[in-house]
Regions:
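Membrane-proximal helix-turn-helix segments that form the acceptor-binding/catalytic region
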Residues: 23, 82-89, 104, 108-112, ...
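A short helix/loop element that forms part of the nucleotide-sugar donor recognition site in Leloir-type
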Residues: 48, 191-205
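Nucleotide-sugar donor phosphate/pyrophosphate-binding loop at the beta->alpha transition
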Residues: 74-79, 116, 127-151, 195
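Acidic donor-binding loop of glycosyltransferase active sites
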Residues: 156, 282-299, 312
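Carbohydrate-associated surface elements
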Residues: 164, 184
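Nucleotide-activated donor-binding/catalytic signature segment of Leloir-type glycosyltransferases, i.e.
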Residues: 254-278
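Conserved acidic donor-binding segment of nucleotide-sugar-dependent glycosyltransferases
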Residues: 328-339, 347-353
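A charged, aromatic-enriched C-terminal amphipathic alpha-helix characteristic of glycosyltransferases
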Residues: 353-384
């Protein structure tokens, strides 16, 4: 099948929706489909991807775009839609595969060119407006609720990245054809002991230290302030603990470093800029504990399954963003506050019996979401829905009144 993926993001970057979209493209390619990508005019070159990447042309005004909703993003989406129409004039596709609000663009363009679309739903659009503090105005939230409703109802299939996202789609349209495909970022876990030791040495972390690692974006939604507030409590009981946070920009790191200094823990907290995805397995191998302090949202962090597959204990807040994937059997779940999170980290560092039990179950959770058989079946369901929708549109077009 010839597929045009619509990615309303700075593609490529090694986190969030762009990273999810990248791996979706690779999985579609691996299943024999021809994939083109249409995205914003900003972003990096994607590694090891067969797909052709077409970037929006037009006045973008900025060379980068922040994560989350913004007025600039709305303008970028307008440019993306004009470029989508142009692309569809130049080439025929069997399916439009759209991420996030790109589904509305796909619905409009698909109606003109008689092409079905799949909505890859990463979260609830109106919920993002409030979680990212873009606007509190009811009129603005209502507009995004309408966009989500139109996107779900018109899609031949909705690919939800988690069970909670699937529930959000069905709340909009109970009859929607939904398939849950949890983000699974394929990386090699074949990291030698020497590589892990060298990475620890790079940051001055000796064998006597216990390394607590966070990887991912540093946006406020990730609740890294909560993580830092937990550090003094952890150090009071495990003074050899060291925290390494990987994935920030210089301004983000400066802000969090200032918080660490105010808390008096700057000497025990290290920061690193965003790293390429291929480098992350070495960080996971070097760590003693992996953490995810996020509280808000319904879209699980993409790091969860790589965390579980790493063979290291995982500590996360016991909130919907995590507990739709994680349970107390495969991870250490904590109340969503600093004191509770600190207790979880301390348990991961000092309770080997509990850790052993979670690691055994983590392997089963990864297998349930990431087995080739399960993912093949999920993608086959999506493609079957797209094929059926394409046939129906062709029949309608061939009917006497179909034109």
């Amino acid at each position: 099948m010839r597929i045009l993926k619509i990615i309303p993001q700075a593609f490529y970057t090694s986190r969030g929706t762009p990273l999810s979209a990248y791996h979706r493209a690779k999985e579609l390619e691996a299943r024999g489909h021809e994939v083109d990508i249409l995205t914003y005019g900003v972003g990096e070159e994607a590694p090891d991807l067969k797909a052709r990447v077409f970037r929006s042309i037009g006045p973008h005004f900025k060379r980068s775009i922040p994560a989350g909703p913004s007025r600039l993003k709305i303008w970028f989406d307008c440019l993306l839609f004009m470029n989508l129409l142009l692309r569809l004039c130049l080439r025929r596709y069997d399916l439009l595969y759209a991420h996030e609000e790109g589904a509305l663009l796909a619905k409009l363009a698909g109606a003109i060119f008689r092409i079905p679309y799949v909505y890859d739903m990463h979260s609830s659009l109106p919920l993002q407006i409030t979680d990212w503090k873009f606007s509190k105005r009811r009129s603005v939230i209502s507009v995004f609720r309408w966009v989500e409703r139109q996107s779900v109802r018109g899609a031949c299939a909705v690919v939800a990245i988690s069970p909670a996202v699937e529930r959000a789609a069905r709340s909009v349209c109970p009859t929607a054809r939904c398939v849950v495909i949890v983000n699974h970022f394929e990386t090699s876990n074949d990291v030698s002991a020497d590589e892990a030791a060298n990475l620890r040495m790079k940051y001055g972390i000796g064998p006597q230290h216990k390394l607590v690692l966070y990887t991912g974006s540093f946006v406020a939604l990730q609740a890294l302030d909560l993580l830092l507030e937990s550090v003094p409590r952890v150090l009071a009981r495990v003074p050899e603990a060291v925290f390494l946070l990987v994935g920030g920009s210089d301004p983000e790191i400066a802000e969090l470093r200032a918080q660490a200094e105010r808390l008096g823990v700057a000497s025990s907290v290290l920061f690193e800029q965003m790293q390429p995805q291929r480098a992350i397995p070495a960080y996971l191998a070097a760590a003693d504990v992996l953490v995810s302090p996020r509280v808000k949202g319904i879209n699980p962090p993409g790091k969860l399954l790589p965390y579980l597959a790493s063979g290291k204990p995982v500590v996360a807040t016991d909130t919907l963003v995590h507990n739709q994937i994680l349970t107390e059997r495969c991870a250490i779940l904590t109340p969503p506050h600093a004191a509770g999170f600190a207790e979880g980290v301390v348990a991961a560092l000092t309770d080997p019996e509990r850790v052993a039990k979670t690691l055994a179950e983590a392997t089963q959770v990864v297998a349930s979401y990431c087995s080739p058989t399960a993912r093949d079946a999920a993608y086959a369901d999506v493609i079957a829905a797209a094929s059926a929708a394409g046939r129906n549109r062709n029949v309608a077009a061939a009917a006497p009144n179909g034109a």
